[in-house]
Amino acid sequence: MLEKIDLNKKMSKQEYSESLPKIEAELGRLQRECKDLDIPVMIVFEGFGASGKGLQIGKLIHSMDPRGFEVHTIKNETEEERMHPFLWRFWIKTPEKGKIAVFDGSWYRKVWVDRFEKRTREKELKDDFASINAFEQQLSEGGTLIIKLFLDIDQDEQEKRFKKLEKKKETQWRVTQGDKERNVKYDEYALMAEEMLFCTDTDYAPWTIIEATDRRFATTKIYMTVIQAMQEQIRRQKENSALLEKTNKIVEEVCEEKEVQIAQYAENRFSEVSILSKTDLSCSYTKEEYKQKLDKLQRKAERLHGELYRKRIPVVIGFEGWDAAGKGGAIKRLTEKMDPRGYVVNPTASPNEVEKAHHYLWRFWKAMPKDGHVAIFDRTWYGRVMVERIEGFCTEEEWKRAYKEINDMEKDLANAGAVILKFWMHIDKEEQKRRFCERMENPEKRWKITEEDLRNREKWDLYEHAADEMIMRTSTAYAPWVIVEGNDKYYARIKVLKTVTDAIEKRLKER
């Protein structure tokens, strides 16, 4: 891409002065329209040292309302960031709907600067490029506009700018030893940039090369690129909104009852026989067997938890299942003897307004554990393909897309070294009814049952279909589903504890 770029392109001062006020005004207008339409925007600045990224960011945001954007300067990872998966620090910086996030440097640092400086191993590159593309695809398909700008200058121009910066005491600090080394090895560094651009130039997040030798030309091209991308996204958003409104109207006319719509969404495309229906729910332990196994496994979990911390291995454990299936009880027994400083239990409720304004995976990425710690989720990101699917809180396109998005996220966690386990706590309909009645009759447990639990029970078959498809599509070698026979609480709790300790022990041996 770079070898075909004409770096001699220029713009006269007069032409620049005449055009700038108009394009600044247009960008300000488009920012307001993106806000009104709830369009999140990410603008990524990458490029060679001294190509003018900071200067151009300053010019671009000059015409924007400062309440609607945030600039993120990306440098080497902090200690906290190093203890999380590679993309964690970028997920938590993604903008909410209607806001703009500007990145001075980005996730591309890992596959360019860090690669050049040997901090990224060559054998990791394929996975890193795949993770980056999946990250951008998820955000794009979720409605985020991603604009990627690469500021290009040649070796001589870069060297000239470095010398100019070094002449002034107040700007000397901006030229580092690393900058000088990359200038000396410009061709090697540029070749890595070429590969980065080639591997990550996609329809949903294309690169635009900015000829940055002439700063007036660069400023104008950046403005026009951002403006055109915003205009196109706004056009698509309006078209999609109109199409969705039309589709919803047709659905309402065709489907007399909401349950018909739900049944269509819940159609099982894999098999007529439910995976869950094959589960043997007769498994049980006596109280004495339970006590003996529980004490032994809890002591083992306590010991392994300390080993995890010392070897800096993160663990992600997700619990899904029927209401009253025993998720809370299993979590309590799992953590009872673990050091509370080393784990967090994340109860997942309906998203709040801030969470709704972000990609649905954003709130889960924020809660992912750092190395050596354990994150336990009481309900998880699988709500997208369960309750949101069945209750119509997301579109059919969105929940169908979510299987790949979730697999990609879990793959990123696994690549970062995490042990990932997902439990489906399974009981039959009669056992659920018995537990519901027990809760309603006991004043101390009545708070545990809600009207929503009773409504969900009426849709048992729909949830069972959705759970079957979820397990089939997202049980992987790196993030397996474990179906827990839960009619007997003693058996269920022991199975969870044994599965977790076995998985951790296996990983520790691999280290």
Positions of predicted regions on the chain:
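Glycine-rich phosphate-binding loop of ATP-dependent small-molecule kinases
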Residues: 1-511
